[in-house]
């Protein structure tokens, strides 16, 4: 047998790529310096994988921003507005992901969506009528050649043509079938050039095959691959899947003239059953047996039990998905050994893959013995009081009274807000000064009194600024918070926090998910101090800002020893206690963010309710079910596909919900109208994930489009997400335009 991985983290052990790229964005280094630093980082990563004994090393899994965007650039799927910018290739590439606003032009970034059921986001290309698909880039060849010069014959990785078409957008009047022939020709040209450079095998990532597929989608897949595989240009083709099983196309897949198939044996419910039903002797099976999404040690006995049931003769052991979804290494963590031994980050997962391979080959007995010992004892005890509280919950605990319509009238009278009320999602820019003060406080260089004085002064400044530009519902800015999940987790029992456990979320942005180690309870009030302080500084309502239980769970590394449902209910009770304390402190508008609600929705529709929504929605309702009718509950959701779960979202029974909608062209509005959505809505009127400031009239046009679909009495005006990562000048300029546009729209009602 041999070993490999689907992909490796690219930000670097200490987020080197992030910091270098941000220097480039700030024009502190040149394009050449950025490219040189990235080349050094790739060499370092390849060397790590090689030294760990992995026999097949991937290349082109690295990206300066996003692999899906890389594929779009490679195949010339670039809007004319960006093609025409008088910029370098790299500048145009970044313009697709970040937008561009400067002397050469003004273009908006492409949409951004969640990558399947992860917290990674991909950039969504758009096929237009004038799109000419052709081989236009060279990154995949350059990186293969780089590795070859280091003595490594790597396996290049590329998004497969089916997934590329399935996850892209199409201009009205064009469809995926229109681009099959040109896309196949472009892929075959890639094959030919790689073969010429000395490559022997290419990995085509086809994660879209693990979703429910219609007859038309299966036909598209087969049409693409029958044409593509008719001439492989001498390359072996590995068709790699992950995030689930391929039950809809397995029979077709094994009959295609591919040389190898990669399947997920971790998240694929039916993968083992499918393979036991037969796997071709002339193909290699890449067995995704080490979890690429979670950070717990692999249980070797359980993995070996699965491997023993696989009838395939030619096997390569691999990760269940790319390792970009886990942190780099545990080597830089400071946990006690008794804790650390339970964790495997990306580098340690290389060891696990190698160990499993060795054990199967009659070696590795010491590794197996150590692993058995690790799993021989209970890792953590139970909180009996918490378990009893959950067991005692009844239907009434999940039901808020009175019903929405009655609450809406009560709140209208209580708050007396104007039509189209304005607010923001919660956070304001975290400047270098804010971060430096927090760090100094953590290090003990700043006293509690000094730190509190700084936070109070900063909150005062932003409360006054919001009043000055005439916002209707204010926020305190969240300057005391580092991360919307970590901040809460630090005040909950059962949580652990890594020092350097960064994971890429989008572009160069990393998140550091906490680890749910044991049962979760609230230790102390978390947000009451600063939310109530901010409310005391103004007569306007100030929103209390909380992270919801499903998002806290989804943006953490969850336990594997209890169900995620039970873990979420534990978190929900902790956040419920916080909601009630905020209300008691006089905070009458409370936002409970569920930014990641859609994220862990099963990829197959048949699993949506039983496996997820039937407990995720009640968990949210549990949090706010006992607040008074004149307390207004808001929630917020980030980049995801929401249109297919609108009724479930309405059933959360919040009073107001804000969506990301601007970057995806307000697509959700038609569905809100069709489903008679009852909750008041704030479909973000400008995209904060791009540094560009909306043009004069841009927000006005967006509001006009919203009001064409949603009754004005139901509409709130807000950005599409929090402003933590933006600069102060662009934030203030954008928000002033937002308030002006809202006032102008009111006059037209």
Swiss-Prot record:
Gene3D superfamilies: 3.20.20.210. L-homocysteine binds at residues 425-427, 478, 593. 5-methyltetrahydropteroyltri-L-glutamate binds at residues 15-18, 114, 555, 599. GO terms for molecular function: 5-methyltetrahydropteroyltriglutamate-homocysteine S-methyltransferase activity; zinc ion binding. Its EC number is 2.1.1.14. Its cofactor is Zn(2+). Pathway: Amino-acid biosynthesis; L-methionine biosynthesis via de novo pathway; L-methionine from L-homocysteine (MetE route): step 1/1. It catalyses: 5-methyltetrahydropteroyltri-L-glutamate + L-homocysteine = tetrahydropteroyltri-L-glutamate + L-methionine. It is an enzyme of class 2 (transferase). GO terms for biological process: methionine biosynthetic process; methylation. Zn(2+) binds at residues 636, 638, 660, 721. Keywords: Amino-acid biosynthesis, Metal-binding, Methionine biosynthesis, Methyltransferase, Repeat, Transferase, Zinc. Pfam families: Meth_synt_1, Meth_synt_2. The keyword NAD does not apply. InterPro entries: Cbl-indep_Met_Synth_N, Cobalamin-indep_Met_synthase, Met_Synth_C/arc, UROD/MetE-like_sf. L-methionine binds at residues 425-427, 478, 593. Binds 1 zinc ion per subunit. The active site is at residue 689. SUPFAM superfamilies: UROD/MetE-like. NCBIfam families: met_syn_B12ind, PRK05222.1. Catalyzes the transfer of a methyl group from 5-methyltetrahydrofolate to homocysteine resulting in methionine formation. Belongs to the vitamin-B12 independent methionine synthase family. This is 5-methyltetrahydropteroyltriglutamate--homocysteine methyltransferase. The gene is metE.
């Amino acid at each position: 047998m041999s070993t490999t991985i689907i992909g490796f983290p690219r930000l670097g052990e200490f987020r080197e790529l992030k910091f270098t790229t941000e220097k480039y964005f700030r024009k502190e280094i040149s394009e050449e310096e950025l490219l040189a630093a990235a080349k050094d980082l790739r060499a370092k990563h390849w060397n790590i994988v090689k030294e760990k004994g992995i026999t097949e090393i991937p290349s082109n899994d690295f990206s300066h921003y996003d692999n899906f965007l890389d594929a779009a650039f490679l195949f010339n799927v670039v809007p004319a507005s960006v093609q025409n910018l008088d910029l370098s290739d790299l500048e145009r590439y970044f313009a697709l992901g970040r937008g561009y606003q400067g002397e050469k032009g003004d273009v908006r970034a492409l949409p951004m969506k969640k990558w399947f059921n992860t917290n990674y986001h991909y950039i969504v290309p758009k096929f237009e009528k004038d799109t000419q698909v052709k081989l236009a880039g060279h990154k995949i060849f350059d990186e293969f050649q780089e590795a070859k010069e280091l003595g490594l014959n790597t396996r290049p990785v590329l998004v497969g043509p089916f997934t590329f078409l399935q996850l892209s957008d199409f201009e009205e009047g064009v469809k995926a079938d229109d681009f099959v022939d040109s896309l196949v020709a472009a892929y075959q040209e890639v094959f030919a050039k790689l073969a010429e450079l000395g490559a022997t095998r290419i990995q085509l990532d086809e994660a879209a095959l693990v979703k429910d597929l219609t007859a038309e989608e299966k036909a598209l897949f087969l049409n693409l691959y029958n044409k593509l595989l008719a001439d492989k240009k001498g390359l072996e083709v590995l068709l790699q899947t992950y995030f689930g099983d391929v039950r809809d196309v397995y029979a077709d897949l094994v009959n295609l003239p591919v040389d190898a198939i990669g399947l997920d044996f971790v998240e694929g419910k039916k993968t083992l059953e499918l393979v036991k039903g037969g796997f071709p002797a002339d193909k290699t099976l890449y067995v995704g047996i080490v979890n690429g999404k979670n950070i717990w040690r692999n249980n070797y006995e359980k993995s070996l039990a699965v491997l023993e049931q696989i009838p395939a003769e030619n096997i390569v052991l691999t990760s269940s998905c790319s390792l970009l979804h886990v942190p780099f290494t545990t080597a830089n963590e400071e946990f006690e050994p008794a804790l650390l031994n339970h964790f495997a980050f990306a580098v340690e997962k290389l060891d696990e893959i190698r160990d499993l391979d060795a054990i199967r080959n009659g070696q590795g007995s010491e590794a197996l013995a150590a692993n058995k010992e690790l799993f021989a004892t209970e890792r953590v005890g139970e909180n009996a009081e918490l378990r009893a509280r959950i067991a005692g919950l009844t239907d009434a605990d999940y039901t808020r009274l009175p019903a929405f319509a009655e609450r809406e009238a009560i709140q209208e009278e209580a708050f007396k807000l104007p039509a189209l009320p304005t607010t923001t999602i919660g956070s304001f820019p975290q400047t270098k000064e804010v971060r430096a003060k927090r760090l100094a406080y953590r290090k003990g260089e700043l006293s509690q009194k000094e730190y509190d004085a700084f936070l109070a002064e900063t909150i005062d400044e932003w409360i006054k600024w919001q009043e000055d530009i005439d916002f209707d519902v204010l926020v305190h800015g969240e300057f005391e918070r580092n991360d919307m999940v970590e901040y809460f987790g630090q005040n909950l029992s059962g949580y652990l926090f890594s020092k350097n456990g960064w994971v890429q979320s989008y572009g160069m942005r990393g998140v550091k998910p906490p680890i749910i180690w044991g049962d979760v309870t609230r230790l102390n009030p978390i947000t009451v101090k600063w939310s109530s302080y901010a409310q005391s500084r103004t007569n306007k309502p100030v929103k209390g800002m909380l992270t919801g239980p499903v998002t806290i769970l989804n943006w953490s590394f969850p336990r594997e020893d209890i169900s995620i449902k039970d873990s979420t209910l534990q978190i929900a009770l902790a956040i419920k206690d916080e909601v009630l304390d905020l209300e008691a402190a006089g905070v009458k508008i409370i936002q409970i963010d569920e930014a990641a609600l859609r994220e862990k929705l099963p990829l197959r529709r048949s699993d949506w309710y039983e496996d997820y929504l039937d407990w995720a929605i009640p968990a949210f309702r549990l949090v706010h079910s006992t607040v008074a009718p004149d307390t207004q509950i808001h929630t917020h959701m980030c980049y995801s596909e929401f249109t297919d779960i609108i009724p479930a979202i309405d059933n959360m029974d919040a009073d107001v919900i804000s969506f990301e909608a601007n970057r995806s062209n307000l697509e959700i509005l038609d569905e809100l109208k069709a489903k008679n959505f009852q909750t008041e809505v704030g479909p973000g009127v400008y995209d904060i994930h791009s540094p560009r400031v909306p043009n004069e009239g841009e927000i006005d046009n967006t509001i006009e489009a919203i009001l064409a679909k949603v009754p004005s009495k139901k509409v709130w005006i807000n950005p599409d997400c929090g402003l933590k990562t933006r600069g102060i000048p662009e934030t203030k300029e954008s928000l002033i335009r937002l308030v002006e546009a809202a006032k102008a729209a009111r006059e037209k009602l």
